[in-house]
C-alpha cells in the first residue's frame, strides 16, 4: 500500500515513532481486525484502531446502547441510549466520522461457535471485547486452530486482565484457565460494578498490543498475563508459559468450537 499525502499528514506522528515508521503504517493500513463485542473494551479499541488507520474493522455485537453504558463505553452518547440504537450501527457511524478511509463492517449478532469462522474470515487479528469466558474460549479455540492471533482482556470492578495470544509462540487462554468459571462465580459488571477509567486504560493497552501485531512487530508484545487493580494501582505480570497439558494448543482439541 502506498501512502497518500493525506495519509502522510494524518499518521505523521504515529510514523515518527520509530518502532512503527512508514513500513509499519503501511502494514497497519493493509490489515483487518475483528472486534468481538463493542461495549466497554471494544468501543475504545475500535476507535483507537480506526484513528491508527487499520484498513478494515469488523465489529460484532447484538446489544443496544443503554444509559448505563455511557460512563465507560466510547463512541456512544445519550441520544444513542435514548433511541436504544444497536451498538454496531452507532459505532460504525462514529467510526466513519473519525476516519472515513477505514472500512467498517457492522455485524449485529452475538459471536458463537457457529459464526466465528465467517466473522474472522480474512482478518489478521481478533480483539476480545466480550463480557464472558465462554465466548473467549470459542475465540481461543478458533485462534489456535487457524493460527490467528488474538488479544484477551477483561475488566470487572477495578480489576483488569490482559494477555496477547500468538498461536505456536505464546500460551493460549486454556493454558492459563482450565475451563470457563461457573456463571455463578464469574462476577459481571452488572453485579460488581466497573470503574470507567479501568476500561479505557486496559483497552488502550489492548490496542497497543494489536498495533504491534498488525505493524509486523509481534516480537514486541508483552508475553505475560498482566493484572492491574486500578483502584490500588497494583500491577502483576504473571509468566504465561505454554502448558504441556493444554488440551487446546498442545492436544489439538477444540471443544468450544465443536460444542
Predicted ranges, named:
Residues 1-259:
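Adenine nucleotide-associated cytosolic modules
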